[in-house]
């Protein structure tokens, strides 16, 4: 199946994480990988924390 985001892509996160229910608003993160069964993404934030999010919560980072 097609992955919208590849590993090491920089993304902007707007949504609620699945690990601890934290809400992220306009946070930048790096995609680590995609779960092939649940089809959600594991991302690492700038502070080093990681969380799982659905594809709808992510969009490509433009800039830099």
Where are these regions (language model features)?
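Basic/aromatic-rich interaction segments and small domains that mediate binding to polyanionic partners
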Residues: 2-64
């Amino acid at each position: 199946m097609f992955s919208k985001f590849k590993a090491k892509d920089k993304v902007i996160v707007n949504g609620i994480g699945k690990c601890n229910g934290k809400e992220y608003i306009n946070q930048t993160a790096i995609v680590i990988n995609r779960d092939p069964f649940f089809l959600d993404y594991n991302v690492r934030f700038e502070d080093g924390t990681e969380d799982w999010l659905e594809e709808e919560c992510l969009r490509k980072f433009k800039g830099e």
